[in-house]
Amino acid sequence: MNKLLSLATYKQNMKSKLLLLTSLLALPVCAQDDIKDQFNPVMTAVVSQSIAGDARAAAMGDLGAATDPDVNSQAWNPAKYPFTISRSALAINYTPWLRQLTNDIALLNAVGYYRIGDYQAVSASLRYFSLGEVITEAGDMTIKPYEMAVDVAYSRMLSETFSAGVALRYIYSDLSGHYDDNVKPGSAFAADISAYNQSYVFIGQRECQLGLGINISNIGSKISYGDDYSYFIPTNLRLGASLMVPINEYNRISFSADVNKLLVPSMPLKHEGEEEADYQERLKTDYYDVSSISGIFKSFGDSERGFKGELEEIQWSVGAEYCYNDKFFLRAGYHHESEMQGNRKYYTVGAGFRMNVLNVDAGYTIATEPSNPLDQTMRVSLSFELDALKDMFGY
């Protein structure tokens, strides 16, 4: 929650470089005496990389590591593309973000893939996150901060049931709109490593599709905004499973679950009685100066709350999808995050309709707390199957 509210703070004021950075890198301060009880969520830069961009995945609780492959697999598990039925497709996704707080923050992304033969595929996506307009304190200038990322991926079947993929990504973040010379645009390079297994199992007399997936995303450099500090990007480990059960010739239902953990170290908290200068020095040495790769390994055992704290860093999602005749879809899900890591808990619902060429999907978020800025978030996705488009025009 603190991550989301920090965006609203950014919209309200822009007094200094610190405010620019903390709008996306919130540093929570709590008054508890026991350091183990302090609110200390894992913080990252470029939070747009952690937002579910497509309506189908969002309607199922923000999951997609092992769901039936589709055009939007790039963000969830690129290794799924060789198992797609259509040879090629394009998608455009739009998400108005934090509409409970403001009306001009939005995420837009475009995705496409092409399957080469029967065993491999290439894919790419472009993600643009607009932070709206910010009027400077002097009122003499309006800036438009934004984040963007472009990535390409290659995936290949290594057996009849197993595939692997790798993606390369460039991330760019401009928080100041070139207004403050002391705050520079930041950039980072990252890679994803993913794998997917699709097999069939019998449950009674029904042959069901079982999907298992893993995606380690955003393994790469840290990002800096022109000062002496560098910030972690959201390196993430995602594991998923999905079971598709045919009911009869026209109906089927899928059940899916994902767990994910940020592979980013927790920020050290100030100890009772510790001098501020000593704390800042320790913070720089034990956090800001830690490399991204070292941070991955450190993230598994650095919580001030011990093993319990490490478990609290795990988010999980469950979702279901009902399909009628490959034309109509109904979806629902739930996403859970610990209170100590942000308390993002919400239900999701959605629907989809597939025509010969065009697929239309929508997703809607219902937060467990009405005050949650994610409440009533709507996502819309349009996708086009290029094979069907070629057939329509006789190519």
Regions from the language model: what does each represent?
Residues 15-21:
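Sec-dependent signal peptide recognition
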Residues 1-14:
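N-terminal secretory signal peptides that target proteins for export/translocation
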Residues 26-28:
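N-terminal signal peptide c-region/cleavage motif recognized by signal peptidases
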Residues 32-395:
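Subset of outer-membrane beta-barrel
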